[in-house]
């Protein structure tokens, strides 16, 4: 997710860092 970058455990899409 947003914390881990890209898609992660948060279950939602996040920014590619």
Curated annotation (Swiss-Prot):
Cell location: Plastid, Chloroplast thylakoid lumen
Principal location: plastid
One Gene Ontology cellular component annotation held by this UniProt entry: chloroplast thylakoid lumen
Keywords: Chloroplast, Plastid, Thylakoid
Domain of life: Eukaryota
Name the UniProt record assigns to this protein: Thylakoid lumenal 9 kDa protein
Organism: Spinacia oleracea
């Amino acid at each position: 997710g947003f914390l881990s970058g890209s898609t992660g455990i948060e279950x939602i899409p996040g920014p590619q860092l």
